[in-house]
From Swiss-Prot:
This protein binds specifically to 23S rRNA; its binding is stimulated by other ribosomal proteins, e.g. L4, L17, and L20. It is important during the early stages of 50S assembly. It makes multiple contacts with different domains of the 23S rRNA in the assembled 50S subunit and ribosome. The globular domain of the protein is located near the polypeptide exit tunnel on the outside of the subunit, while an extended beta-hairpin is found that lines the wall of the exit tunnel in the center of the 70S ribosome. The lineage of its organism: Bacteria, Pseudomonadati, Thermodesulfobacteriota, Desulfobacteria, Desulfobacterales. Part of the 50S ribosomal subunit. GO terms for cellular component: cytosolic large ribosomal subunit. This is Large ribosomal subunit protein uL22. Belongs to the universal ribosomal protein uL22 family.
Length: 114
């Protein structure tokens, strides 16, 4: 079973928010996964969809059958955290953490049933 993957890195969204979405598309066909993501109202859905389309393009480049592709796995890892400060009362400041994510989409050809 041949596999192909695509990675979107340094995305400005927290990994916890994206992980909630990806459980809904694992194991589905690419077409069903794209339809599911298209109708989700979250920012992360668009980012995962972009990574999924990139993986499909990589599969086309490897001359794989795009119609028979299945979403094998979607990994969401934490990227570097940007640290920002917000002024507060009495001359103090609080730290704001702006988290980033790395999304890896792994596709595989559907196993032929004998």
């Amino acid at each position: 079973m041949e596999q192909v993957s695509a990675t979107a890195r340094y995305l400005r969204i927290g990994p916890q928010k994206v992980r909630m979405l990806v459980d809904g598309i694992k194991g589905k066909s690419v077409e069903k996964g794209l339809n599911t993501l298209r109708f989700m109202p979250n920012k992360g859905a668009g980012l995962v969809e972009k990574a999924l389309r990139s993986a499909v393009a990589n599969a086309e480049e490897k001359n794989m059958d795009v119609d028979g592709l299945v979403i094998l796995n979607v990994l969401v890892d934490q990227g570097p955290t940007l640290k920002r400060f917000r002024p507060r009362a009495r001359g103090r400041a609080t730290r704001i953490l702006k988290r980033t994510s790395h999304i890896t989409v792994v596709l595989a050809e559907k196993a032929a049933k004998n």
